[in-house]
């Protein structure tokens, strides 16, 4: 062998010795012994044949056999003892490492368990506190109901789960469950009376929650309402499919249509005030604490405007009424256990809506693989940063803006502007933010549109400004400055803006948030990159030109056929619900007649829209032909039985005393 080969073999031997010694945790001793071995071998011979034999010796020495032992070499007893020592101590090192890992895992598990137990104890403390407060405030409750647990709480009230004491002997599935809403003593009596009036006169039908009875003891009031199991909107809004979203919105609009027939504005339509059971499909609109009635002249009737005669009429109707029994077949114990289980699951995790908007649901994994395989941590970080940049663009507001003085009336004769601003931030329409006094039921329609926007975009909450000025800026950043300026002018208001803002396309905005990983895939980014590695950006929406969100974009856009699960009519309904001008905004009754709620609009992912429309048209033609043949052979009785349905009217009445409630519920 020449000198180069000898040097190469020596370098490999030194590296192998070091790695072997490090792996056994005995680098110091083994390195010293190896140096001694090198000295002895170098003095043994200097010819090339001797070097070759020495290299072969070291190579054979560090090759383990299948049995875990090392090959024996004559004249190397000292090194063989070291090999046996290393092999004996290797299992000991591995065992110590495993013990340390088990100890660390045990410590982490104990910390996690202690955190869960602390949260459970805190929940139990709040539960016991709510039960004790209800029992002390209204002692009559203990004579009628078995109160189990707290199922909800708010600023003005606490809701608890209860069952009738006289039904203790029944099977658990046959016991009726009730939601006991205990109003805080700080709650204004007019608010309680308004909510009671709405539930008594409006509720009980058309997806609107009703009331069984009302119990009053001194200054404390409790509403007894039917109980329904429901899912948290935050847990299901990204996993709902197209039929479920359509049914959800249909039920919401049915409830709003019924409420608006009584010239009542709910004013607090939001997901937390909607009880929706995904398994059963049941739906209820609740919480009428902010509801307001519209007068004949179009103005909103304030609570203080109610005359004593109207108040006496309401109380008289409540006093003369009788209770209504509502049956339900769910188990109270099962519902309480499910509720506590959901609370524990929520305590274990969470996750922000921005992160979920970037990562997407599991179903998008196939699209991600088609777009270009797996993403690195850097790609995910870039996607999140881009999504946050878009959110900041939508929620941009000047830091110098005064949140308390941003609306100016064009009529200088009016010194002050008095308008109702009740509602939840993020769901208030432009007319409320502009403090327009003559508000209508279009306020609730806008809130329904915001809920639909969250369902289609997969982003909740979509609007989250801390004050009215920021909320109006969010609306301007999405719908442009000109529609808001025109609406403000029609409402006798004036808006001053520092710059113009273009209108964004609602469909592309929803697609951008719902399928963020697809539009931000590295392969698509490289597809539209310039030679210098940069990407052309749109100056208006601050997005890449291939993913421009402007409504009248002239850029070369990336196509998304087969990616969107919603038809075009869904975004048409969304634009009508979110009409900036309240006078042009669609009503709940008109929205129910929209083609979006027709069964013919079904979208299959992966198939272009024009092919799906052709298939749906052919299927519709075949179904119409079959129905025509079937009806031509129908007799009159069978046709009547198919079209006519029996209608039974159950009058809704109420009782106001605890004794009557105990005997009539």
Swiss-Prot record:
It catalyses: L-seryl-[protein] + ATP = O-phospho-L-seryl-[protein] + ADP + H(+); L-threonyl-[protein] + ATP = O-phospho-L-threonyl-[protein] + ADP + H(+). It comes from the Eukaryota. SMART domains: S_TKc. The active site is at residue 268. Pfam families: Pkinase. The keyword Nucleotide-binding applies. Keywords: ATP-binding, Kinase, Nucleotide-binding, Serine/threonine-protein kinase, Transferase. Interacts with chif (via N-terminus). This is non-specific serine/threonine protein kinase.
């Amino acid at each position: 062998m020449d000198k180069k080969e000898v040097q190469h073999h020596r370098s490999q031997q030194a590296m192998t010795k070091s790695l072997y010694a490090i792996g056994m945790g005995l680098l110091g001793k083994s390195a010293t012994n190896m140096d001694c071995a090198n000295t002895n071998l170098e003095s043994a011979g200097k010819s090339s044949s001797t070097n070759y034999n020495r290299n072969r010796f070291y190579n054979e020495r560090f090759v383990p056999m299948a049995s875990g032992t090392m090959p024996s070499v004559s004249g190397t007893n000292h090194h063989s003892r070291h090999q046996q020592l290393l092999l004996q101590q290797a299992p000991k090192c591995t065992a110590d490492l495993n013990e340390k890992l088990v100890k660390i895992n045990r410590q982490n598990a104990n910390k996690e368990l202690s955190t869960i137990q602390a949260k459970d104890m805190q929940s139990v403390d709040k539960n016991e506190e709510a039960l004790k407060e209800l029992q002390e405030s209204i002692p009559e409750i203990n004579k009628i109901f078995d109160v189990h647990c707290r199922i909800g709480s708010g600023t003005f009230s606490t809701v608890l789960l209860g069952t009738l004491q006289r039904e203790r002997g029944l099977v658990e599935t046959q016991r009726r469950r009730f939601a006991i809403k205990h109003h805080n003593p700080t709650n204004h009596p007019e608010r309680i009376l308004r909510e009671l009036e709405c539930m008594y006169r409006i509720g009980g039908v058309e997806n609107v929650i009703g009331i069984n009875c009302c119990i009053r003891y001194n200054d404390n009031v409790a509403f007894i309402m039917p109980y329904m199991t429901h899912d948290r909107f935050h847990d299901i809004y990204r996993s709902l499919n197209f039929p479920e979203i359509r049914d959800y919105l249909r039920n919401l609009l049915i409830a709003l249509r019924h409420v608006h027939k009584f010239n009542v504005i709910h004013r607090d339509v939001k997901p937390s005030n909607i009880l929706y059971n995904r398994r059963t499909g049941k739906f209820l609109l609740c919480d009428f604490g902010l509801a307001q009635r519209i007068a004949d002249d179009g103005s909103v009737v304030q609570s203080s405007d109610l005359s004593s005669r109207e108040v006496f009429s309401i109380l008289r109707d409540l006093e003369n009424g009788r209770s209504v029994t509502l049956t339900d077949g769910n188990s109270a114990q099962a519902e309480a256990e499910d509720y506590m289980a959901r609370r524990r699951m929520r305590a274990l995790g969470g996750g922000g809506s921005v992160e979920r908007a970037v990562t997407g649901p599991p179903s998008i994994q196939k699209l991600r693989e088609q777009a270009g395989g797996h993403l690195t941590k850097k790609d995910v970080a870039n996607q999140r940063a881009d999504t946050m940049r878009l959110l900041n663009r939508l929620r941009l507001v000047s830091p110098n803006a005064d949140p308390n003085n941003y609306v100016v009336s064009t009529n200088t004769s009016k010194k002050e502007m008095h308008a109702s601003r009740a509602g939840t931030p993020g769901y208030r329409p432009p007319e409320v933010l502009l403090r327009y006094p003559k508000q209508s039921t279009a306020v609730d329609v806008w809130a329904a549109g915001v809920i639909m926007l969250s369902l289609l975009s997969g982003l909740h909450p979509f609007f989250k400004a801390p004050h009215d000025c920021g909320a109006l800026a969010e609306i301007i950043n999405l719908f442009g400055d000109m529609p808001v300026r025109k609406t403000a002018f029609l409402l006798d208001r004036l808006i001053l803006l520092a710059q113009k803002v273009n209108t964004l396309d609602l469909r592309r905005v929803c697609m951008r948030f719902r399928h963020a990983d697809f539009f931000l895939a590295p392969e698509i980014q490289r597809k539209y990159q310039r030679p210098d590695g940069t990407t052309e950006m749109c100056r208006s929406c601050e997005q890449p030109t291939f993913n421009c969100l402007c409504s009248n974009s002239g850029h070369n856009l990336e196509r998304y056929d087969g990616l969107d699960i919603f038809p075009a009519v869904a975004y048409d309904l969304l634009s009508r619900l979110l009409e900036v001008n309240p006078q042009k905004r669609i009503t709940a009754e008109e929205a129910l007649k929209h083609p979006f709620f027709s069964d013919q609009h079904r979208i299959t992912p992966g198939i272009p829209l024009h092919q799906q429309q052709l298939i749906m048209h052919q299927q519709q033609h075949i179904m119409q032909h079959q129905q025509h043949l079937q009806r031509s052979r129908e007799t009159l009785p069978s046709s009547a039985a198919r079209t006519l349905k029996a209608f039974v009217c159950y009058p809704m009445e109420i009782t106001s005393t605890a004794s009557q409630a105990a005997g009539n519920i």
